[in-house]
Curated annotation (Swiss-Prot):
Name of the protein this chain belongs to: CAPA-Periviscerokinin-2
Protein's GO biological process: neuropeptide signaling pathway
Its biological purpose: Mediates visceral muscle contractile activity (myotropic activity).
Organism name: Striatophasma naukluftense
Keyword line: Amidation, Neuropeptide, Secreted
Subcellular locations according to the entry: Secreted
Modified residues (Valine amide): 19
One cellular component term from this protein's GO annotations in UniProt: extracellular region
Domain of life: Eukaryota
Family: Belongs to the periviscerokinin family.
């Protein structure tokens, strides 16, 4: 949509555009 969703990765939080 335009919002960003943060996911917990091995190195930390990686924000990616949620569609």
């Amino acid at each position: 949509s335009g919002l960003q969703f943060a996911v917990l990765d091995g190195q930390g939080f990686i924000p990616f555009p949620r569609v």
